[in-house]
């Protein structure tokens, strides 16, 4: 992820020249807001990094189902290890690892862009732009966790479908003229598009609360059901 960020940061300084007079490309990039084409490009790049990082987080959550279907979870849970602790150990990897992944992408982008532009103030600016997506990413982690606890047989398909939906909305939503009501279903649409937009505190706080609620739902659901996917009565 750091190297992907480096690539984005490398291009950022030349994006005005690369786009040139291509109005179509300018319009697509400008849809991400900002007072300059460079900021719009950086906002789009950071969003892409966040979506890539979400893939890592979802895969980490889906390891829970993989352990269960491979019959490796049952021997562990037959010991005094509580179910919620077993799930929490996997969630710690997904939640904590996703922060590291996003930070690496933002750091790579900011460091490269800052060095090329002789402005290392871009490092904290773009690092913060990446980390502001953590709540949206965690919401999808919560969604996958809730599915694992309630309807485990469909968790993989539904979790990846949710990410694919967010990807289409985030990258192509404006181009495809997706209705706002549909686009708003993506948590990433409620995250400030830094550095093009101003920071708003309320959306990340609300997204974090929803993510926490979904994780609790998943933990409670897993406690009530049998291993293998059946639900206890």
For the regions a protein language model found, what residue spans apply to each?
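Membrane-interface alpha-helices at helix entry/exit sites of multi-pass transporters
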Residues: 82-95
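Long, hydrophobic alpha-helical segments
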Residues: 40-64
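Terminal transmembrane helical anchor/hairpin motif
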Residues: 7-33, 158-233
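Transmembrane helix boundary and interhelical loop/hinge segments in multi-pass membrane proteins
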Residues: 58-77
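Extracellular/periplasmic helix-exit of transmembrane alpha-helices
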Residues: 4-23, 54, 104-115
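Secretory targeting signals
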Residues: 92-145, 205-208
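A structural motif at transmembrane helix-loop-helix junctions in multipass membrane proteins
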Residues: 134-168
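Hydrophobic/aromatic residues in alpha-helical transmembrane segments
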Residues: 11, 54-57, 104, 108, ...
């Amino acid at each position: 992820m750091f190297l992907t960020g480096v690539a984005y940061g490398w291009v950022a300084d030349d994006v005005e020249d690369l786009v040139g007079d291509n109005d179509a490309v300018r319009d697509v990039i400008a849809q991400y807001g900002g007072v300059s084409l460079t900021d719009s490009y950086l906002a789009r790049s950071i969003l892409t990094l966040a979506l890539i990082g979400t893939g890592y987080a979802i895969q980490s959550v889906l390891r829970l189902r993989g352990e269960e279907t491979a019959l490796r979870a049952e021997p562990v849970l037959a010991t005094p290890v509580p179910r919620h602790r077993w799930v929490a150990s996997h969630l710690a990897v997904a939640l904590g690892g996703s922060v590291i992944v996003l930070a690496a992408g933002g750091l790579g982008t900011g460091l490269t862009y800052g060095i090329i532009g002789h402005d290392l103030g871009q490092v904290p600016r773009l690092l913060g732009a990446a980390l502001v997506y953590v709540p949206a990413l965690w919401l999808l982690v919560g969604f996958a966790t809730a599915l694992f606890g309630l309807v485990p047989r469909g968790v993989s398909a539904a979790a990846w479908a949710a990410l694919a939906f967010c990807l289409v909305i985030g990258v192509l939503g404006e181009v495809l003229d997706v209705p706002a009501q549909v686009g708003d279903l993506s948590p990433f649409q409620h995250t400030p598009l830094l550095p093009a937009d101003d920071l708003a505190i309320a959306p990340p706080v609300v997204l974090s609360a929803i993510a926490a609620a979904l994780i609790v739902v998943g933990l409670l659901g897993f406690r009530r059901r049998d291993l293998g996917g059946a639900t206890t009565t």
